[in-house]
């Protein structure tokens, strides 16, 4: 040890001192992109899914919602999106809460069109929001919701709403969002109370992708229903401005 001290100088440490040093901090490697994310990247789709946890993507021209976990699809549903006159906005937001048995009041443009009377619709199966609605962001009045016109999901072209997204498999989506089973979803939806359940802030992407992977190696191409082309720069704001940007009272 004396020889080591001479060679290394007074700053050297003994074996005992070295043993007492705290272990080096573990450096964690970034999560590997999921196979689906790799397909998105290969196609040049401008969408970055969380590598861990849940996310919801609505591809407007595909009329489809996909619920992802750890970057992989877990639930797919047909949806009805905004019409070209009242387009669904292209935005990134998050789940805020789930409202069971919502009330509803139409937007001013709906009233002006004569499509709906200016009144508050009570909860129930005749309500245009259906039996439940997923609220997005704080103060963001675009919902993912059930509908009283479920036969419209049979149409191939489903750009029919005033901006909100009607979800065919709404009950399964709500069960997935809240981590509850379908029996509990239906019990709340068919009950007598109107109430909110706070939800985790799951990221929600309302996107406009004309090419999108299907998860089996195939790539689907979709019609440009809003005539936005492939570049969504200034068109993004224009799309939002053209939409009602609200489902009105819920």
Briefly describe each language-model feature range.
Residues 1-9:
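Bacterial N-terminal signal peptides
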Residues 11-250:
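N-terminal pre-domains immediately preceding structured catalytic cores
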């Amino acid at each position: 040890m004396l020889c080591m001290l001479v060679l290394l100088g007074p700053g050297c440490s003994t074996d005992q001192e070295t043993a007492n040093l705290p272990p080096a901090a573990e450096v964690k490697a970034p999560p590997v992109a999921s196979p689906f994310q790799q397909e998105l990247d290969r196609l040049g789709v401008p969408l970055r899914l969380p590598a861990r946890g849940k996310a919801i993507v609505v591809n407007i021209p595909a009329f489809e919602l996909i619920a992802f976990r750890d970057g992989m699809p877990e639930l797919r549903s047909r949806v009805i999106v905004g019409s070209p006159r009242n387009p669904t906005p292209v935005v990134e937001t998050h789940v805020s809460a789930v409202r069971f048995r919502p009330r509803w009041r139409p937007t001013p443009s709906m009233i002006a069109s004569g499509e709906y009377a200016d009144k508050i619709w009570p909860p129930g199966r005749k309500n245009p929001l259906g039996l439940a609605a997923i609220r997005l962001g704080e103060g963001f009045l675009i919902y993912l919701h059930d509908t009283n016109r479920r036969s419209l999901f049979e149409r191939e072209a489903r750009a029919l709403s005033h901006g909100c997204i009607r979800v065919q498999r709404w009950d399964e989506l709500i069960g997935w969002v809240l981590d509850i089973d379908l029996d509990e979803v239906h019990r709340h939806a068919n009950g007598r109370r109107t109430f909110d359940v706070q939800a985790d802030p799951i990221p929600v992407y309302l996107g406009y992708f004309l090419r999108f992977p299907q998860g089996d190696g195939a790539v689907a191409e979709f019609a440009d229903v809003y005539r936005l082309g492939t570049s969504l720069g200034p068109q993004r704001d224009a799309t939002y401005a053209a939409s009602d940007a609200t489902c009105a009272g819920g």
